[in-house]
Design a protein with these regions (language model features):
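Charged, amphipathic alpha-helical linker segments immediately N-terminal to NTP-binding catalytic cores
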Residues: 1-30
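Pre-Walker A adenine-sensing motif
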Residues: 32-44
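Walker A (P-loop) phosphate-binding loop of P-loop NTPases
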Residues: 58
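Conserved lysine of the Walker
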Residues: 61
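Conserved nucleotide-sensing/catalytic segment adjacent to the nucleotide-binding pocket
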Residues: 82, 89-143
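Small-molecule kinase domains that catalyze NTP-dependent phosphoryl transfer to phosphate-bearing small molecules
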Residues: 151-152, 173-176, 201-250
């Protein structure tokens, strides 16, 4: 097996500059074939199509979605893709602070489980996705600089809309009805221990101590990772993230 050739790219992801890297063979053998299939699908349907990219935390799904969108506009013969995040449909912080949920017999504020399925406005997401199939619409975004939702921040108008998020394929009410809105469903799986290491490292890079980062993982991230794995719905194709951050098709 020959050594992987990694290419570095500079992008803006979630409003922040990022340097990312992808394996050149993965770009040629996985990313571009996906974009060609989506191009064929969109042209055959002769309308806007919706693609769901569902993955657990720390798989780089937001970055991947943005990269695929960028690739679609730089490679000849591809239909343009627009990347959109599900995180814009978080309930606003003021709502989360004012509402609670019962967990293990204890009533806790929604702010303490932000990012869990219960902290999203699923009816609003479903309505927006349904409308987006028929016309150009505005989408909210989640701004990580202020850690809150910004309404009507972007216009979704590309022929292919690639929507990414943790729970788009969650096989639980009220989420499971969303899958019928997608023309193509892609899921990324990853080993929980790999995600743990990546999430703790990300927190430490953000200024947390290793102990605090590990505690946050156990309280917040770990339940979400387990829930994703246990209740992931059907997908048209499944990729797996490897230990070096590469992707393979299963």
């Amino acid at each position: 097996m020959r050594e992987k050739e990694w290419h570095t790219y500079e992008m803006i992801v979630n409003g922040l500059p990022q340097k990312i890297r992808y394996n050149a063979d993965t770009v040629e053998g996985l990313f571009l074939p996906l974009l060609r299939r989506l191009t064929e699908m969109q042209r055959a349907e002769a309308r806007r199509i919706l693609v769901f990219l569902a993955a657990p935390p720390a798989t780089g799904k937001s970055t991947l979605a943005q990269f695929l969108a960028q690739l679609s506009r730089t490679e000849e013969g591809l239909t343009p893709v627009q990347a959109l995040g599900m995180d814009g449909f978080h309930y606003p912080n003021r709502y989360l602070a004012a509402h609670t949920i019962l967990r293990d017999g204890e009533e806790i504020p929604l702010t303490s489980i932000k990012g869990a399925p219960e902290t999203f406005d699923v009816p609003a997401l479903a309505a927006k996705l349904g409308a987006a199939r028929e016309e150009s619409v505005t989408f909210p975004v989640y701004d990580r600089r202020i850690h809150d939702v910004v309404p009507d921040a972007v216009t979704a108008d590309a022929p292919i809309l690639l929507v990414e998020g943790n729970w788009l394929l969650l096989d639980e009410e009220p989420w499971r009805d969303l899958c019928g809105l997608a023309d193509h469903r892609l899921r990324i799986d990853a080993a929980p221990e790999l995600l743990r290491d990546r999430l703790i490292a990300r927190k430490v890079q953000g200024g947390s101590t290793t102990e605090a980062a590990a505690a946050f993982y156990e309280a917040s991230d770990a339940p979400n990772i387990l829930r994703f794995a246990a209740h992931a719905g059907a997908a048209d194709e499944i990729w797996r993230m490897t230990a070096d951050g590469d992707f393979t098709r299963m």
